[in-house]
C-alpha cells in the first residue's frame, strides 16, 4: 500500500483535531490566529468533498485518515530530512503498522502526505534523496582506500574537526555552511527523534567528499565521521525500525 494526498496546513490541522492528535513532532503548524472560523469552514468543505471526512452525528474520518492518525499517535521514531535540493522538509513517522511521510515542497503551500506499508519502508527511506544509489560496500572498503590516499583521510579528519555543529544547530543553517573555498558540500541533514522521550537523539550530516559521501554522526556525547556505505544504510534502517 502506498497512497498520496495533498493537504493545506489548515486541512491538516482539522484532520489532526478530528483524529485526536494534539501535536506532531518536527513540523510547524499554523497558529490559532491563522485558523479562524472561515479557514475552518473552507478546510472542512474541501475534506468532505474529497471523502477524507464524513459528517454524521459528528465528524468522522475515512479509513485512510484513521490509519494516518493511528500512525501519528503510535509512532516510535521520527526521521526529519532536510536536503539542499528538492523537498524543503520531509518527516517520516515510523510505527509498527507502517509509516507516514509528510513533505513540504519549496514552491507549494500544500503538504504532501504519503502512506507507506511496513514492508516498503526500507526501500523508500533512501529513495528520492540526493544521495547516490551505489555507495561503498562497507566502512572497511573506505578505510582501505584511505591508506593509499592520504588526502581522503585528511578530508575526514578536517570534517570532524572543523564542522562545529551540535544538536541545537538548525538543519537549514547546517546546509548553508561553506568550506574554506566557499563551496557548500553538505547535501543533507537527517535528524532522528525518539518519541519515548520526545527528543532528538541522533543527527546525521551527509557531506560530499572525494570518495562519495561522508557522514558526520552526532549521538549522545560522541562525534564520528563514517563513509556512506551499504553497510551504514542497512544499520540505519534497522535502527529506525
Identify the role of each PLM range.
Residues 1-48, 54-58, 67:
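Short, amphipathic alpha-helical interface elements at domain boundaries
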Residues 4, 24-28, 54, 59-241:
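Non-catalytic recognition/regulatory regions in large multidomain proteins
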Amino acid at each position: 500500500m502506498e497512497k498520496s494526498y495533498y493537504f493545506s496546513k489548515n486541512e491538516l490541522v482539522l484532520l489532526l483535531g478530528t483524529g485526536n492528535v494534539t501535536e506532531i513532532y518536527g513540523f510547524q503548524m499554523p497558529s490559532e490566529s491563522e485558523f479562524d472560523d472561515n479557514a475552518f469552514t473552507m478546510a472542512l468543505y474541501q475534506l468532505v468533498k474529497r471523502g477524507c471526512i464524513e459528517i454524521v452525528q459528528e465528524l468522522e474520518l475515512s479509513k485512510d485518515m484513521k490509519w494516518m492518525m493511528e500512525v501519528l499517535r503510535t509512532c516510535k521514531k521520527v526521521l526529519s530530512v532536510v536536503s539542499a535540493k528538492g523537498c524543503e522538509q520531509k518527516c517520516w513517522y515510523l510505527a509498527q503498522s507502517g509509516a507516514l511521510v509528510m513533505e513540504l515542497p519549496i514552491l507549494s503551500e500544500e503538504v504532501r502526505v504519503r502512506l507507506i506499508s511496513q514492508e516498503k519502508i526500507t526501500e523508500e527511506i533512501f529513495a528520492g534523496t540526493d544521495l547516490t544509489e551505489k555507495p561503498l560496500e562497507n566502512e572497511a572498503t573506505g578505510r582501505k582506500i584511505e591508506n593509499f590516499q592520504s588526502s581522503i583521510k585528511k578530508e575526514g579528519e578536517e570534517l570532524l574537526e572543523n564542522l562545529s555543529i551540535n544538536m541545537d544547530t538548525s538543519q537549514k543553517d547546517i546546509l548553508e555552511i561553506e568550506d574554506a573555498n566557499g563551496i557548500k558540500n553538505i547535501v543533507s541533514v537527517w535528524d532522528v527523534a525518539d518519541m519515548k522521550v520526545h527528543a532528538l537523539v541522533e543527527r546525521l550530516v551527509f557531506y560530499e567528499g572525494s570518495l562519495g559521501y561522508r557522514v558526520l554522526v552526532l549521538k549522545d556525547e560522541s562525534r564520528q565521521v563514517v563513509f556512506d556505505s551499504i553497510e551504514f544504510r542497512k544499520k540505519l534502517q534497522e535502527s529506525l525500525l
